[in-house]
Amino acid sequence: MKKILVVLFLFVACALYGQGLTARTFNSGFSEAHDTYNGISCASDGNIYYVLCATSIDFGGKVYRYELRKDQIKYLGDLTEICGEKDLKTVPQGKSHVLFHEYKGKLYFSTHAGYYNMIDGMERLATIVPPGYKAYPGGHLLAYDLKTSTFEDLGLAPQNEAVLSMSMDKQRGILYGITWPVGYFFSYDVATKVMRNFGPVAGLGESGFGPTYRVLCRSIAVDPETGSAYFTNPEGDIFCYRLGADKVEKLADENMRKDYFGKYDPADSGSMGYNWRQTIWHPGEKVFYGVHGNSGYLFRFDPRVPRIEVLDRLTSEPSQRAGMGDLFSYGYLGFTLGPDNRTLYYLTGGPVYQDGKRIAGQEKVAMGMAKGLENLHLVTYDISTRGYKDHGPVFYPDGQRPTYVNSIAVGSDNKVYTLARVVENGRTRTDLVQIKVKR
């Protein structure tokens, strides 16, 4: 009877939302795993590397490798232990919020706190911890050697903050990052091991309250040709760090304040404001493609002009027909360029209808979170033809919806990999999910 109901549900869903896709779920063996943002990449060895996060005071997030050829998952390590903080009773290294960046046979990434204090509906760096525990020691920069399968701790982020955003100049071996909650912009030279702190990027960042709050940029766009690094603030300013400079500069001739993106209060903690949500470098065109999270608009950023060109809206077809934005308050991070260097992949939302009415969700939230239930859609965009395609909603074989999806990697098998919530036997965990794209 249950199987009949599942088949009926999928039939109705496909009729309402389009053809749709069925996702395969994995079990990495981490039942307490919580939501991951970014935290997944495909490496040159053809394997998928990912982090499953944790919000516990007692253990950290965990690193895994999915081996495509063997179709098996290998556990690589606990973030807290990798950072040398096992049994120290400090707030654990619960998360990694960044992609893996490959350089000379190593994957570079960083850590973030997962245990917070909730204040006025917002996640705050924990200053109040249980008796016997200590405060968060700070995020670490880490390297994983693909040949020896060993980790290296490169040290702490500036001001003992967590690392929220990180990218890499792979031509010169320089990491760029933004910390949390204040938001210090920093660089780390892999060869010389020199860390430089260039100061806060947006006032008090996410440590502020009320009018002093500023949501931080989640994507640092690095131009490998010049070595320049770009990021935004919620006011819509674009900042540039030029290789060798002593400070960051604001671009005078371009910004993200576009009418198509909407109107935002930069002190609003429930949106990304005018920040870009995710960016990716296109090696052939030597430009960035990016998505503005709250509007879902695709744009092209040529740093040499500089110029932002708004292209098309990448939200799902049901969202466009409804005229509504995604229900994830920051918009989605799952945006990347495929191996063919012409196809953009985007995991976005789509409205859910009940009795013919759209489930609206909450009007306002105070942090990055889902305001209500929505479907997951896979959208592809052919850069050469400006060809948009919504592949329809994604469901698990049992009819459930993947939720809290803010990561993406396209494997050497041309399948899409992400991290999403999975419910099994009444328990919810975040785990690896595979989506086969219908061509």
Model region roles, listed by residue range:
Residues 53-57, 61, 109-136, 347-373, ...:
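Short, conserved, GDST-rich strand-edge loop motifs in beta-rich repeat architectures
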Residues 402-439:
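Blade-level signature of beta-propeller repeat domains, shared across WD40, Kelch, NHL, RCC1
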Residues 26-29, 76-92, 152-161, 198-212, ...:
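Surface-exposed loop and turn segments in beta-propeller and other repeat-based domains
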Residues 27-61:
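Beta-strand-rich domains and repeat architectures in extracellular enzymes and scaffolds
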Residues 63-69, 127-147, 187, 298-302, ...:
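Beta-propeller blade signature
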Residues 42-45, 102-104, 169-172, 223-226, ...:
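Residue-level detector of Asp-centered blade-edge/turn motifs that repeat once per structural unit
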Residues 34-39, 84-99, 161-167, 206-221, ...:
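Repeated scaffold domains used in trafficking and secretory/extracellular systems
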Residues 290-291, 324-383:
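Loop/turn-rich, solvent-exposed surfaces of beta-rich toroidal or solenoidal domains
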